[in-house]
Amino acid sequence: MKVERVLLKDYTTLGVGGPAELWTVETREELKRATEAPYRVLGNGSNLLVLDEGVPERVIRLAGEFQTYDLKGWVGAGTLLPLLVQEAARAGLSGLEGLLGIPAQVGGAVKMNAGTRFGEMADALEAVEVFHDGAFHVYCPEELGFGYRKSHLPPGGIVTRVRLKLKERPKEEILRRMAEVDRARKGQPKRKSAGCAFKNPPGQSAGRLIDERGLKGLRVGDAMISLEHGNFIVNLGQARAKDVLELVRRVQEELPLELEWEVWP
């Protein structure tokens, strides 16, 4: 187990965030020890806005045994989702194609039910192991209340591993599906971002609504509504959380959109 003081801007895809004590755990016993004081869990740092003052709690990151995987068995929650998508395709296993391009670890993808219009994480789950109240518990997906970009994990629960529901299919068919998903994601920005900023209202596109209001390019400090896709806030270099939050506020003055990101603290 490694404990160090860090700036969380170096661990988030938006490149924003203040100081914290980072606990990198590699075994189940280390995880038990790390959770003996108040904590938060950090995955790949996407879909997350950390405030400039940082967080007082321990920040736990899963490594070691939590990054091992077997596509036909248990998959560690610290495994990168893009890696799994590619490995499944190579093995001729279908079920993850709709998650192509999501820069998450498995645990974070489960917690927020990450997805695209082509599919959600919950669709690919057979079982989920969650650590809470000092023990490891296995749940079926139906017990975790998955919905649009959300789940209902037990309070303080940490996803530790999952079993995937994959089907054998011809590789050519899987690759065609992945190419379709990739084409749909081409308009997304290449600059630092935390992913889609706002949840899509029922039957509508948040990005399209933002575009129609002429908000693309709106900027506060180095935080800007992407010119490429209205539902992305990008970091032009030195953005701070306060800049991002002010930008969010200005968008929400114009449109009744719900922020999709988690905000710490």
Curated annotation (Swiss-Prot):
Cofactor(s) named in the record: FAD
Pfam families reported for this sequence: FAD_binding_4, MurB_C
Signal peptide start-end: none
Protein name, UniProt field: UDP-N-acetylenolpyruvoylglucosamine reductase
Active site residues of this protein: 149, 196 (proton donor)
Subcellular location as annotated: Cytoplasm
Annotated segments matching region Disordered: 182-203
Pathway participation: Cell wall biogenesis; peptidoglycan biosynthesis
